[in-house]
């Protein structure tokens, strides 16, 4: 696999996130082949036809309504399939129904002979990334979740608006669960090497209460958007496109994705969001940022919360019987 061109993507799930992701791939000229799988075959046929009409403005690409068997020679399978988060519902409320969907999808993808990389975006993403690893039997590095990539983008954008700097020049991360127990790594947030906490103090941008409020607006952004329009999909779609490009082009880009935890942060046997080098083999190398004591406690708490849910779910025979890892 290391020597072949990584240009074929199979998307499973043609809902709001999936179709937005497909549109992002077309707009950005990412991948040479895109197959779309969904229970609603006509929807995938319609989207494939509609998307193909944009190719004359972007770059050549084969786009089609696919079946699970088409994943056999794919380089990347992207999972957006799952029940959507409803108003007032947390990502963790989705666990069991989306575990069932994930088990079914992953089993069918693996049965096709697929040997590439799994990229998981369905929620709760850290738990479903773990489940994809368990159900697939794949090496840990070849199962990647979108993790805190969207949260980090939201964080950088919120900071950029406050300090009047291009968001791409803000170096800051959200880590932990993609959800309510996530946290901001303020100890390493900086612009051009200047810590943002110091910048705030010197330039009178934000006081302590405003800093807390800014983070909370980032953490709770999905709830706000869901209450207004029913779902979030544009931001995560572009985040997935960015991760896709890093994998297909073997970029070795540092991105905040959902990574298997081996005890580096006092957390084991689960996936959590942290920066990692991402390339053709998936997670090439996790980057373990040295956290301060408060941040370490938050990472441990986030992991403990997810691990408890994982253990409870996988104690059930319907999931335990499908485990390959």
UniProtKB/Swiss-Prot annotation:
Substrate binds at residues 85, 91, 123-126, 151-154, 232. Beta-D-fructose 1,6-bisphosphate binds at residues 156, 171. Allosterically activated by fructose 1,6-bisphosphate (FBP). It is found in: Cytoplasm. GO terms for molecular function: L-lactate dehydrogenase activity. GO terms for cellular component: cytoplasm. Keywords: Allosteric enzyme, Cytoplasm, NAD, Oxidoreductase, Phosphoprotein. It is an enzyme of class 1 (oxidoreductase). The modification Phosphotyrosine is found at residue 223. NAD(+) binds at residues 17, 38, 43, 68, 82-83, 121-123, 146. Its EC number is 1.1.1.27. It holds the Pfam family Ldh_1_N. The active site is at 178 (proton acceptor). Changing residue 213 to E: In strain: AM4 and CM1-3. Pathway: Fermentation; pyruvate fermentation to lactate; (S)-lactate from pyruvate: step 1/1. It catalyses: (S)-lactate + NAD(+) = pyruvate + NADH + H(+). Belongs to the LDH/MDH superfamily. LDH family. This is L-lactate dehydrogenase 1. It comes from Lactococcus lactis subsp. cremoris.
């Amino acid at each position: 696999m290391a020597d072949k061109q990584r240009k074929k993507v199979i998307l499973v799930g043609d809902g709001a996130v999936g179709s937005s992701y497909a549109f992002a791939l077309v707009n950005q000229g990412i991948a040479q082949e895109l197959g779309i799988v969904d229970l609603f075959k006509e929807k995938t046929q319609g989207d494939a036809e509609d998307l193909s009409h944009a190719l004359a403005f972007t770059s050549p690409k084969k786009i089609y309504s696919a079946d699970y068997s088409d994943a056999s020679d794919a380089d990347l399978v992207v999972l957006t399939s799952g029940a959507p988060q409803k108003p007032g519902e947390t990502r963790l409320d989705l666990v069991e129904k989306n575990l069932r969907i994930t088990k079914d999808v992953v089993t069918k993808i693996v049965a096709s002979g697929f040997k590439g990389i799994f990229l998981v975006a369905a929620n709760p993403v850290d738990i479903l990334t773990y489940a994809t690893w368990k159900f697939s039997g794949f090496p840990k590095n070849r199962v990647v979740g979108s993790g805190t990539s969207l949260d980090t983008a939201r964080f950088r954008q919120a900071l950029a608006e406050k300090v009047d700097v291009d968001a791409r020049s803000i170096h800051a991360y959200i880590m932990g669960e993609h959800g309510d127990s996530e946290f901001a790594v303020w100890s390493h947030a900086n612009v051009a090497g200047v810590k943002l906490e110091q910048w705030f103090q010197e330039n009178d941008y934000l006081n302590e209460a405003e800093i807390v409020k800014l983070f909370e607006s980032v953490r709770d952004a999905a709830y706000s958007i869901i209450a207004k329009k029913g779902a979030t999909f544009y931001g995560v779609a572009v985040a997935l496109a960015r991760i896709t490009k890093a994998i297909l082009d073997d970029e070795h880009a540092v991105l905040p994705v959902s990574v298997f935890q081996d005890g580096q942060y006092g957390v084991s046997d689960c996936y959590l969001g942290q920066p990692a080098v991402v390339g053709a083999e998936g997670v090439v190398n996790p980057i373990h940022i040295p956290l301060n004591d408060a941040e370490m406690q938050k990472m441990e708490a986030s992991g403990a919360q997810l691990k408890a849910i994982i253990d409870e779910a996988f104690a059930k025979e319907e999931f335990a019987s499908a485990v390959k890892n």
